[in-house]
Design a protein with these regions (language model features):
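A cross-family phosphate/adenosyl-ligand binding-site feature
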Residues: 1-171
Length: 171
């Protein structure tokens, strides 16, 4: 009997409490692998998003009731990183079939608010490359993303940043 760790499906990176950046991964490969290893009598830990765990394929195979399956639900790349850190080291085989997002939202702003902030900066005589770059990368006009952002914001801009790279941390 082997101990297998499998990741499956997409990661979700939230812009606000309802909008997210994700990808088209269904998690099918990870679910199929999980099914086959469980059929062989192996112990499987599956790290996956709710969309995979609650998906029709997962239920059709009756995976949720298998005593040899440990499910670790995650949503974001950071969640997956933490789960992998907690689980790593005690497995015979690790299969990373998850489609992890490359970017996550850092903050949001409206073009109008950014234009006002830049005009103010220029009027104060702060027109150096460093001043402008600092304003663009850390503006005062950030939209509060702790709640739902209004769907009436015509010029909403989302600044993305890189997510944690997981493969190098698995080694």
């Amino acid at each position: 009997m082997k101990k297998i760790l499998i990741t499956a499906g997409p990661t979700n990176e939230y812009i606000d409490e309802v909008m997210k950046i994700t990808n088209m991964s269904t998690g099918r490969l990870g679910v199929e692998l999980t099914k086959n290893y469980l059929k062989n009598g192996d112990l499987v830990t599956l790290i996956a998003t709710r969309s995979v765990i609650r998906g029709g394929l997962f239920e059709r195979y009756g995976l949720s009731s298998n005593p040899n399956l440990k499910i670790v639900p995650i949503e974001t790349t950071d969640d997956m990183y933490k789960a992998l850190e907690e689980e790593k080291g005690s497995y015979d085989l690790v299969i990373h079939s998850s489609a992890v997002g490359d970017y996550k939202p850092e903050f949001s702003f409206t073009m109008e608010a950014m234009a006002e902030e830049l005009v103010k900066l220029i009027s104060e005589g702060k027109v150096s490359y460093e001043d402008i770059l600092n304003t663009l990368t850390n503006p005062n006009c950030k939209v509060n993303d702790d709640t739902k952002i209004s769907s009436y914001e015509p010029n909403l801009t989302v600044k993305l940043t890189l997510t944690t790279k997981l493969i190098s941390n698995l080694r």
